[in-house]
């Protein structure tokens, strides 16, 4: 099967979802991931399941998932692959990541809804520290961060034309 056929006929393997494999969420901390791993590793460890090939394979998957999710650089790559929705496995994507990422510059990362809603009409989070105009919002919230990191400083606001251009309104 060629690489293109593999991509076109790709069916996502549930074992590729490291978060589900470990019983974690994408917002889990390294400590939470490690704790979940320890519980499952004890259950599937080859010493406790002598001769059980399935338990040994599961243990190897758990180990790989933990190693990937506990190292920040690997986790960032894994999350990028997971959110891309691209039709290939994580290992295949890793082998081609430099080529694939060149064509993913347009993709928008999936973000979860915020747990706490601010007051209606009032922004919440880091954007509430700076100006509340659309140009000061993060790009993921429908605006470009034109005011620098937190909107502090003595910067003058950009012209209306520049704001519209940067927000893809013209």
Curated annotation (Swiss-Prot):
Transmembrane segments: none annotated. Residues 110-120 have a biased composition (Basic and acidic residues). Residues 121-135, 142-153 have a biased composition (Low complexity). The keyword Chaperone applies. It comes from the Eukaryota. SMART domains: DnaJ. Gene3D superfamilies: DnaJ domain. GO terms for cellular component: cytoplasm. Residues 17-82 form the J domain. Keywords: Chaperone. The keyword Chaperone applies. Residues 101-170 are annotated as: Disordered. This is J domain-containing protein. It comes from Manduca sexta (Tobacco hawkmoth). The lineage of its organism: Eukaryota, Metazoa, Ecdysozoa, Arthropoda, Hexapoda. The gene is jdp.
